[in-house]
């Protein structure tokens, strides 16, 4: 079966069409703007899979309807999913704009004095607003000379932010969310909303009962040679932690081996269900070999599976990580308990950064007073105002131990194409695999246990659905925190010390939900959240605006907020603008 091609970014150089001197004098400068934009994007951005982003430039500069149509024909044939229009001069507004209502679009008007690029930018944006097709404005802060071919830093920042978010939109369109199972323990996010996926993300939902996973395991619908490789890899790399179960619930060596085997098989089969596996076709299992074209998935697990079979912790942790027995590779997006809305936040984070995501319960707010009462020690540094305990039963990406290193030697989580095998091994070495607690998981399993290194910048996100309003996005930038060992051990033991922990301190603003750490916890909209590496809340805000998902909570600096120009016409309060604009335009793929 032919592999689906990756979306490309189309560059549209537009120009003043008057011949006899005007157009001729602008051709080279205009096309050079397009080439410079393409070169910047190709150099600085990759797809989430690690592939280089391909830019497609119109064959000619665009002066009017005919050349605009020719450009559109070229883009349509080359899977262009995002467009950037560039110009240093006046052009004919509505005659030259990109009219595709579902394709993210931006316009860069060169800030120069010789020709009025700003005037075209304003005229074109007015046309976009009047026609109900929002576009992003890019206009440099400082005037440039006509022969200056450099891209100013502020223009570069907007071009790249737009491109990252636009590619995320284009990459999700046409894919599916694989819902393995149904509603887990009444968790609202696992009440999978097909309309949300279809109307806001352009995705489908593939609902599959957990018996399909059981069938694949029992009937050996998997690569048996790969299973042996996975088992050998686990034998070499897994370090087992304490079994805290009562003696009557402890398993013997043979039983533990069977649990490990099934856990690895679950990872393989969920992966195959998501993306397919041509090895299955070689076994005559052509239908199963195709997969479900899933860019994200969720596994219900609790309780209808986990009361009888090994839990999904090992499978989810390995799939969500940037490495396994096949080496370093792109992480998958698999939501615990089939929390599809947390899965979407994971998907956003992965598409924007190319990194693995940490799925966690937003479990406990620890005030400075409570910590001192319990441990006899005071919180300090980033943690001085209190911390949030992010912990789940073991499905977080192993990258979350932060044993990878950036260019300055600091702990981080890298895009998978930058991760060395040594860094992957370090993450594995920092992880213990603890037998699942019987009271929670009667069918057994292994939970990954690690502690995230401190001082690492993170962005915590969550998508919620509000009846009568639709989806909203929450964002909280902050840092992981390293606690003194004795303090960590005492606090961790009060929850479940066999699970992975991140101590998180959000950046406070003194206002609203970021008045203090307690307010962040109190305003969080659900029991789950996602950690994405870096302070990338601004990218999430831009992506949300493209999809028409309002942001109900964030602590991103106002100067970094980048939304379509038409948002400014929806009032003077920028967050109110966001709500009104999203309501006015409706979901991107509304029918």
UniProtKB/Swiss-Prot annotation:
It is found in: Cytoplasm. Pfam families: Fucose_iso_C (PF02952), Fucose_iso_N1 (PF07881), Fucose_iso_N2 (PF07882). Mn(2+) binds at residues 337, 361, 528. One of its GO terms (cellular component) is cytoplasm. It catalyses: L-fucose = L-fuculose. Keywords: Carbohydrate metabolism, Cytoplasm, Fucose metabolism, Isomerase, Manganese, Metal-binding. The lineage of its organism: Bacteria, Pseudomonadati, Pseudomonadota, Gammaproteobacteria, Enterobacterales. Its main location: cytoplasm. Converts the aldose L-fucose into the corresponding ketose L-fuculose. The keyword Transferase does not apply. It comes from the Bacteria. Homohexamer. Pathway: Carbohydrate degradation; L-fucose degradation; L-lactaldehyde and glycerone phosphate from L-fucose: step 1/3. The gene is fucI. Its EC number is 5.3.1.25. Belongs to the L-fucose isomerase family. It is an enzyme of class 5 (isomerase). GO terms for molecular function: arabinose isomerase activity; L-fucose isomerase activity; manganese ion binding. Its cofactor is Mn(2+). The active site is at residues 337, 361. InterPro entries: Fuc/Ara_isomerase_C (IPR004216), Fuc_iso_dom3_sf (IPR038393), Fuc_isomerase_C (IPR015888), Fucose_iso_dom1_sf (IPR038391), Fucose_iso_N1 (IPR012888), Fucose_isomerase (IPR005763), Fucose_isomerase_dom2_sf (IPR038392), Fucose_isomerase_N/cen_sf (IPR009015). This is L-fucose isomerase. GO terms for biological process: D-arabinose catabolic process; L-fucose catabolic process.
């Amino acid at each position: 079966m032919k592999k689906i091609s990756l979306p490309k970014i189309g560059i549209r150089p537009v120009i003043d069409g008057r011949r006899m001197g005007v157009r001729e004098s602008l051709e080279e400068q205009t096309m050079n703007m397009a080439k410079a934009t393409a070169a910047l994007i190709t150099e600085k951005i990759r797809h989430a899979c690690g592939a280089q982003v391909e830019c497609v430039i119109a064959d000619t500069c665009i002066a009017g309807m005919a050349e605009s149509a020719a450009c559109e024909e070229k883009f349509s044939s080359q899977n262009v999913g995002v467009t950037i229009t560039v110009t240093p001069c006046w052009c004919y507004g509505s005659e030259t704009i990109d009219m595709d209502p579902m394709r993210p679009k931006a316009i860069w008007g060169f800030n120069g004095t010789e020709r009025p690029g700003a005037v075209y930018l304003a005229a074109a944006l007015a046309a976009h607003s009047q026609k109900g097709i929002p576009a992003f404005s890019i206009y440099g802060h400082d005037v440039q000379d006509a022969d200056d071919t450099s891209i100013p830093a502020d223009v570069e920042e907007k071009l790249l932010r737009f491109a990252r978010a636009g590619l995320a939109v284009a990459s999700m369109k046409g894919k599916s969310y694989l819902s393995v199972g149904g509603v887990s323990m009444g968790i609202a996010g696992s009440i999978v909303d097909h309309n949300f996926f279809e109307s806001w993300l352009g995705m489908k939902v593939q609902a599959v009962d957990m018996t399909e996973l059981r069938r694949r395991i029992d009937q050996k619908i998997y690569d048996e040679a790969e299973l042996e490789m996975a088992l050998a890899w686990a034998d070499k790399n897994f370090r087992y932690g304490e079994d805290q179960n009562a003696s009557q619930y402890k398993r013997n060596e043979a039983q533990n081996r069977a649990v490990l085997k099934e856990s690895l098989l679950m990872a393989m089969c969920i992966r195959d269900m998501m993306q397919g596996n041509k090895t299955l076709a070689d076994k005559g299992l052509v239908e199963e070999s195709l997969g479900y074209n899933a860019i994200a998935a969720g596994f219900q697990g609790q309780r209808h599976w986990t009361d009888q079979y090994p839990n999904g912790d090992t499978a989810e942790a390995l799939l969500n990580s940037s490495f396994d027995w096949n080496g370093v590779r792109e992480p998958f997006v698999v939501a615990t308990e089939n929390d599809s809305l947390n899965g979407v936040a994971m998907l956003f984070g992965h598409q924007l950064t190319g990194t693995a995501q940490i799925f966690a319960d937003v479990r406990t707010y620890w005030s400075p007073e409570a910590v001192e009462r319990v441990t006899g020690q005071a919180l300090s540094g980033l943690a001085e105002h209190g911390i949030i305990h992010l912990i789940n039963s073991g499905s977080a990406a192993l990258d979350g131990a932060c044993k990878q290193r950036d260019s300055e030697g600091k702990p981080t989580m890298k895009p998978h194409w930058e991760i060395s095998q040594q860094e992957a091994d370090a993450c594995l070495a920092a992880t213990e695999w603890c037998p699942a607690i019987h009271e929670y998981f009667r069918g057994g399993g292994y939970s990954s246990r690690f502690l995230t290194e401190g001082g690492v910048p993170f962005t915590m996100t969550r998508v919620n659905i509000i009846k009568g309003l639709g989806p909203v996005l929450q964002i909280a930038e902050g840092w992981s925190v390293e606690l003194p060992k004795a303090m960590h051990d005492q606090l961790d033991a009060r929850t479940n010390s066999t699970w992975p922990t991140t101590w998180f301190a959000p950046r406070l603003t003194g206002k609203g939900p970021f008045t203090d750490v307690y307010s962040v916890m109190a305003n969080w909209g659900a029991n789950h959240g996602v950690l994405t590496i870096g302070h990338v809340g601004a990218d999430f805000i831009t992506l949300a605006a493209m999809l028409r998902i309002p942001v109900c909570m964030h602590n991103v600096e106002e100067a970094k907020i980048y939304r379509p120009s038409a948002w400014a016409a929806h009032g003077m309060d920028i967050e109110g603008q966001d709500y009104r604009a999203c309501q006015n335009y409706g979901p991107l793929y509304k029918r």
